[in-house]
């Protein structure tokens, strides 16, 4: 009897262990399948929609037919875009020598011409500017042995004191690295082609000094940023060689939109802030008591701020897309219900993107709120009963935990449905990081944060970063620079 009881206990333990192993195997298989999808599958997060789940077959058929009809009428043969008219033109005439008729020998007359344009590239031109300052002295004082006075014009203020770099050269270095992701060792090789020896150490020193000059302008932009009613924030890792931490972080904060919009009262600003940690203190100290709306992902550090947090439906949707990938091809299930509803929310946003703030608020209250109610019902009814697909459980838990932040965007027409604005602002830094890989020192990372801020803010305000940085450097090296005139929306080209 005793042995039988012990045997049953042993069987129960083994069954429990087997269930744990099965769960681990299932989780590993899900991770492997998702990794395969990410590496070899489509990278887009598209979702065709599952209208039949909501008895909307007729609506979908009408949409498809309308789309097909639109395509059949609007499809055009690709046409090459004309070259800009403001580019200088150089004419090359290809004429015949013999202008007599091969048939009768008569003189040919000109009846027209064919013209085609080819785009020529002229390599960068580098020159040396010699600053000559004549010296003047008084001959009378020389002869009378009195004190000789020498007069000479003072040197104009330069970004790099006693250095050879002009504003244009510094702007070239900065835009090459921070706009186009060109590491300094490649720029060093490019200058060698012109017979100019510029070491990486020298260029790095110039970039650090330029970043110091830009610091007052970045502080002015930050003050302007923190005055806005709505902000976006995100962060991404950065390796710093001479640091005790494995990963440091570049935080990004932005306002406005990705491009100039005269109808948008909120200025377009992107600012980067480097820290050697991802602690909540980083964002708390930077925002300095900011109490407006802050669009974020689910990272808990943002909850320590005084801002009203707005959740990101793109993050929520992405988690359900991962669950959809594990569901298998041509299969439908609970994940499709959620994705279809989220797709409808984005459909509303697509239709109202050019509307006024009041119109956006009205549309969201009338159309988006009922969709959110359906999502809430799904959460309450289905989330407790989810089994199997761990990614679906993870996505549902994220949706439930972030729900109060995710639904806030419908309460104000100034708010966005997601945090894609910040994610797009992070992308140029991520692309650049793939080229130069890391920062050597924390000081270098701080300089990068400053210069990325300047380059990206110039871009989203429709400015050419090279020209803007040149003008800024010329002004910022003055004894009393006019900072307000350098704000992108005040800048005169």
What are these regions (language model features)?
Residues 135-493:
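Catalytic center-proximal scaffold of phosphoryl-transfer enzymes
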